[in-house]
């Protein structure tokens, strides 16, 4: 490859960019926090990094998921089989689903208000790193 022999300085940025692209499509997930719903844990307008390879999720994990065509960031407060009380009614979280809330309860639109309060595992894009 004569092109790279004469321009080796191009090889490192090109390979680095390709590696980053592969990582972002397969392992990492770049997210954005558009509201104050996760403050003080995550500040409004901050970028966050998640992993697509997250294994088992547990209560307390912060996830990035899709709902109604939007990406949201919330904390898992109950998992499949657990009971939650919402508006005085006890709900059992279905298997492979999660009940989520924002850390800033006064500024979060989350499972407490949705007509279908559960996030299906198939909608989860990533788990927050860190």
Where are these regions (language model features)?
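Extended hydrophobic leader/signal-anchor segments used for secretion and membrane insertion
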Residues: 1-130
């Amino acid at each position: 490859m004569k092109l790279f022999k004469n321009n080796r300085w191009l090889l490192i940025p090109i390979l680095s960019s390709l590696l980053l692209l592969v990582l972002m499509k397969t392992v990492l997930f770049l997210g954005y926090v558009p509201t104050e719903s996760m403050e003080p844990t995550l500040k409004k307008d901050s970028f966050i990094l998640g992993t697509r390879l997250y294994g088992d999720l547990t209560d307390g994990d912060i996830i990035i998921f899709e709902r109604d065509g939007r990406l949201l960031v919330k904390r898992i407060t109950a998992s499949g089989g657990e009971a939650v009380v919402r508006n005085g009614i006890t709900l059992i979280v279905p298997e492979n689903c999660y009940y989520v809330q924002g850390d800033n309860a006064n500024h979060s639109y989350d499972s407490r208000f949705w007509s279908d309060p559960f996030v299906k595992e198939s909608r989860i894009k990533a788990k927050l790193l860190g």
